[in-house]
């Protein structure tokens, strides 16, 4: 089989409400995942052994990389001994709250299921995905907006697209999920709103009065510890964004814009400050 190249897209979180802490130490949450046009590229080439290389030398290419863990998990599950050479062109920043590693792992599961002719069902792949990480099932199973609960692995396809221009900015600060969960300010006593009808009203009816409900519970602690990240959010709002928020556990921040020219201006302003950025057109979905 000839080498195959596939795009692996990032996501943002529209609202991230941490609802409880389980006895096993994991936190439950409710969030809306939305895809953005920021992607890594993975190339799969035939090989007798399982190997990986990456354009970002800061990332491991052994079993500490989710891509390799995904490949080995599928091998073991299927009893497969076939190899593959994986080349990762890394563009999505890590430690950004954009799910880049999870997206790459999901792409590996899906592609190697075909590449190796494993023919595992989506349900079987879901089990492997959950073991790899809470965000991996979203990238494996969804193309557009999805509501997530549990640890982020219980998904509901909303069949919606965000009708706005989205500017996403990485403030060059790497924040680990472990750090974020250790430092966030719990509000477990709060009654969380149901985000599903709110995002439906936002996307289909243009109802923006609901945007205040889309809080990110990591944001206050992240902003207190990293004021530069807070400034990025304010800069997006000052540039014409009608809503801006931290994505995931950060440090990436995104803003919604009505006009493409305003989004382009904000993008250029952020790039002039040395930040990596992306812009996503309205109604975007993950089509590899």
From Swiss-Prot:
The chemistry this enzyme catalyses reads: 4-CDP-2-C-methyl-D-erythritol + ATP = 4-CDP-2-C-methyl-D-erythritol 2-phosphate + ADP + H(+)
Judging by the UniProt lineage, the source's domain of life is Bacteria
Q: Which Pfam families match?
A: GHMP_kinases_C, GHMP_kinases_N
- Listed binding positions for ATP are 93-103
Q: What is its EC number?
A: 2.7.1.148
Task: Cite the active-site annotation.
Answer: 11, 135
State the InterPro entries in the record: GHMP_kinase_C_dom, GHMP_kinase_C_sf, GHMP_kinase_N_dom, IspE, Ribosomal_Su5_D2-typ_SF, Ribsml_uS5_D2-typ_fold_subgr
UniProt keyword annotation of Transferase present: yes
Q: Does the keyword Kinase apply?
A: yes
Q: In which pathway does it act?
A: Isoprenoid biosynthesis; isopentenyl diphosphate biosynthesis via DXP pathway; isopentenyl diphosphate from 1-deoxy-D-xylulose 5-phosphate: step 3/6
Q: What GO biological process terms are annotated to this protein in UniProt?
A: isopentenyl diphosphate biosynthetic process, methylerythritol 4-phosphate pathway; terpenoid biosynthetic process
**A single GO molecular function term of this UniProt record:** ATP binding
Primary role? Catalyzes the phosphorylation of the position 2 hydroxy group of 4-diphosphocytidyl-2C-methyl-D-erythritol.
The Swiss-Prot or TrEMBL record describes its family as follows:
Belongs to the GHMP kinase family. IspE subfamily.
Q: Which NCBIfam families match?
A: ispE (TIGR00154)
Q: Under what name is this protein listed?
A: 4-diphosphocytidyl-2-C-methyl-D-erythritol kinase
The organism encoding this protein is Chlorobium limicola (strain DSM 245 / NBRC 103803 / 6330)
Q: Write the gene name.
A: ispE
């Amino acid at each position: 089989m000839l080498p195959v190249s596939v795009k692996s897209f990032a996501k943002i979180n529209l609202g991230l409400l941490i609802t409880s802490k389980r006895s096993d130490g994991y936190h439950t949450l409710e969030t809306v995942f939305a895809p953005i046009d920021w992607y890594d590229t993975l190339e799969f080439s035939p090989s007798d052994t399982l190997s990986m290389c990456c354009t970002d030398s800061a990332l491991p290419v052994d079993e500490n990389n989710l891509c390799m863990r995904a490949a080995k998990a599928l091998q073991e599950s299927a009893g497969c001994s076939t190899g593959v050479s994986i080349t990762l062109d890394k563009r999505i920043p890590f430690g950004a709250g954009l799910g880049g590693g999870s997206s790459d792992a999901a792409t590996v599961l899906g592609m190697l299921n075909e590449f190796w002719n494993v023919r595992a069902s989506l349900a079987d792949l879901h089990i492997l995905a959950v073991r790899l990480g809470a965000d991996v099932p979203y990238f494996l199973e969804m193309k557009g907006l999805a509501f997530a609960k549990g640890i982020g692995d219980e998904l509901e396809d909303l069949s919606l697209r965000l009708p706005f221009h989205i500017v996403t900015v990485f403030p060059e600060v790497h924040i680990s999920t472990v750090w974020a969960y250790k430092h966030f300010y719990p509000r477990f006593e709060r009654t969380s709103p149901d985000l599903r009808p709110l995002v439906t009203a936002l996307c289909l009816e243009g109802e923006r009065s609901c945007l205040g409900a889309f809080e990110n519970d990591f944001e206050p602690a992240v902003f207190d510890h990293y004021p530069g990240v807070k400034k990025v959010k304010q800069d997006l709002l000052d540039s014409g964004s009608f809503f801006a928020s931290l994505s995931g556990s950060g440090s990436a921040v995104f803003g919604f814009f009505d006009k493409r020219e305003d989004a382009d201006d904000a993008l250029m302003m952020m790039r002039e400050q040395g930040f990596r950025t992306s812009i996503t057109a309205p109604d975007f979905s993950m089509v590899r």
